[in-house]
Curated annotation (Swiss-Prot):
UniProt GO MF annotations: rRNA binding; structural constituent of ribosome
The family this protein is said to belong to: Belongs to the universal ribosomal protein uS11 family.
Superkingdom, taxonomy of origin: Bacteria
The name this protein goes by in its record: Small ribosomal subunit protein uS11
SUPFAM superfamilies noted in UniProt: Translational machinery components
Subunit structure: Part of the 30S ribosomal subunit. Interacts with proteins S7 and S18. Binds to IF-3.
Gene: rpsK
Any single GO BP term: translation
PANTHER family in UniProt: 40S RIBOSOMAL PROTEIN S14/30S RIBOSOMAL PROTEIN S11
Amino acid sequence: MAKITRKRRVKKNIESGIVHIQSTFNNTIVMITDVHGNALAWSSAGALGFKGSKKSTPFAAQMASEAAAKAAQEQGLKTVSVTVKGPGSGRESAIRALAAAGLNVTSISDVTPVPHNGARPPKRRRV
């Protein structure tokens, strides 16, 4: 049977980019793009093997952020601006992990969508 050859990822020398952190109550997704919005690298707590309620922890968000940062640094990324979306628990730790991984964070902006009284919110949890 013929061996399938996969294209090697071409190393792009991109100096600056944008880190999009989507932090929900269930998971944290980190996506790194260039300034035009083309994806360079991504990672999430679920993709790293965390399952169930462990995906929503700050530690899982930290690991996802480190993995995405490492993949983006292989393509030459050095400085990033961060956009954070969502109410999850992994917001702060994901940003700290980016700085600890060696990326220079220039700005942090919160782009959480706020409804102008749109859909009815889910009922309160009684635990």
